[in-house]
């Protein structure tokens, strides 16, 4: 079984681990609702993508029960 010749020091270990980091998500401003959303995605609250209506909002189950 292979064994390291020398022990890895704290500094070398920490320098190697500094590159593991998260990047900021690409957010864009929705023209319809003026809220930030992820780019290249349909907005959840309005259903618009690139200024066009893609998804129509369906009434939730709670609203359906109160309407009857």
From Swiss-Prot:
Keywords: Ribonucleoprotein, Ribosomal protein. It comes from the Bacteria. GO terms for biological process: translation. GO terms for cellular component: large ribosomal subunit. One of its GO terms (molecular function) is structural constituent of ribosome. Belongs to the bacterial ribosomal protein bL32 family. This is Large ribosomal subunit protein bL32. It comes from Onion yellows phytoplasma (strain OY-M).
């Amino acid at each position: 079984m292979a064994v390291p010749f020398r022990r890895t020091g704290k500094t070398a270990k920490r320098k190697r681990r500094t590159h593991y980091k998260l990047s900021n998500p690409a957010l864009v401003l929705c023209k319809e609702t003026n809220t930030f959303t992820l780019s290249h995605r349909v907005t959840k609250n309005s259903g618009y993508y690139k200024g066009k209506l893609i998804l129509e909002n369906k009434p939730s189950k709670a609203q359906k029960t109160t309407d009857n």
